[in-house]
Amino acid sequence: MDNNAAKPLVTVLGASGLVGTAITRELASRPIRLRLVGRRPTVVPPDARAEIEVRTLDLAVPGAVAEAIAGADAIVHLVAHISGESTWRVSSDDPIAERVNLGLVHDLVEAVRAERPARPPVVLLAGSMSQAGRSSTARIDGSEPDRPLTTYDRQKLDAELAIQAATDEGLIRGATLRLATLYTQGTDSPALDRGVVCAMMRKALADQPLTMWHDGTVKRDLVCVDDVARAFLAALDQPDATTGRSWLVGTGQATSIADLFTIISKVVAAHTGRAPVPVTSVRPAEHSMPTDLLDFVLDPTAFQDATNWAPQVSLLEGLDQLAAAMVAQTASSPA
């Protein structure tokens, strides 16, 4: 018997990004076959137990998705179109964004349809809590009707619906993890993080004031990417419990932007020995999005109950670890 073939094959699409790198680190410790697919070179963890194959592909090229997922028992789809500094700022007339954020999911479904594996593969899609749009409650719990307010969120919702339709058809065993606001604690390179936390941390390290739009009362649910990686593994391990719907993944804790920026200022000061940089309020920029001034805090209870997953990294701990990592990185960089 071919022992290699007996090991499950997990394919990670978007493995070179922030979430993909964290998931790869977790999966690499398992006795599986692991196919890492990204446009950039993917970091392979040292001392990996998994048999790792790295493929550098532009998945938007016709046929690339089919090549990437061929023979996979499970697929983690993390690819998103990045326009400038943030994935969620997408123009409604950007054909590349629609091709990547939605078209690749259609390619995935059609590739599975053509291959017709004996057992439908598990497919996990990375979504966003902001897909729900404006909520009338303090915390999003998944029962709200989806009314996405941005092009990015509409595309992510359409991708989620395509995964759901393919699951209903019996082609795949799919689920979407709608993620809270992500940040890294520096376990992997902070350069991978394009989010607001790392951006403000860099400004504080440069001794620049931290500017927030409006009065800073907007609240966010902030979750460490290492906890998110563990959430994806929990869903992979329990497909019977998670298949067929979307799940909210976060901490359930509300943090105002003013409090977040103040904490960042203080933890950076603690590591540099300088005075904390000021936190100031400015008018929202012209390129601000409808979601920028809305609260987004979620209730992750359903996912926790289904998988026994729970976040392990507190915000203060994560920010302190990130500050330490970025200070160390700055100190080791050539002058």
Give the residues covered by each predicted segment.
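N-terminal Rossmann NAD(P)H-binding glycine-rich loop of SDR-like oxidoreductase domains
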Residues: V10-R30
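NAD(P)H-binding glycine-rich loop region in Rossmannoid oxidoreductase-like domains
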Residues: I52, L57-V100
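Conserved Rossmann-fold NAD(P)-dependent oxidoreductase catalytic core, especially the SDR/UDP-sugar
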Residues: H106-T151
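Mid/C-terminal beta-alpha module of Rossmann-like enzyme folds, strongest
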Residues: Q238-S288
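Active-site Tyr-X1-5-Lys
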Residues: R134, L149-A175, L205
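Flexible, glycine-rich beta-alpha linker
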Residues: A132-G133, T150-T151, A175-R194
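Amphipathic terminal alpha-helices
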Residues: D2, L9, S314-A335
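Glycine/proline-rich active-site loop of Rossmann-fold NAD(P)-dependent oxidoreductases
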Residues: L157, G170, L182-C198, Q208, ...
